[in-house]
């Protein structure tokens, strides 16, 4: 609840989280694309372009709560693995952006012309971490309604948690559509993030 959830924040931040002060731009974009009276979302697109051009991938490393969560997990002492040999997986996030965020909510609609937020509903682990788990802990009605989708999302979250311990921010690198947008805009951003060596 709250009026602040009508305003996007620059990181992956599920609006269903009880403590969320703002909306996730990916979730907000899917809500507009999947609405029965779809109109191009100038606000969300403009917001993403503005923060992407100003800050680029800086956002992913310093302002995204899910990126920070993965970084904390990576600090757990264990053998680490490089993602260099897995570089082709970085292109998955662009497929997720085009397919699950842009096309599927607009094209796969129900009888009243509304599409599901496919990325948020079926893939995003942030929603189950910030929203579903905390809400189900305090509301028995929500606990009673949990089913196969919750189990699926928890499995994705568990996979990301395990991978984050051994790989550096795997979800950000391989699946995050917000990271895909910021990676594209990083080439023209004022704060370009580059790896020296």
Give the label of every model feature segment.
Residues 1-197:
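Non-ligating segments of multi-cofactor redox enzymes
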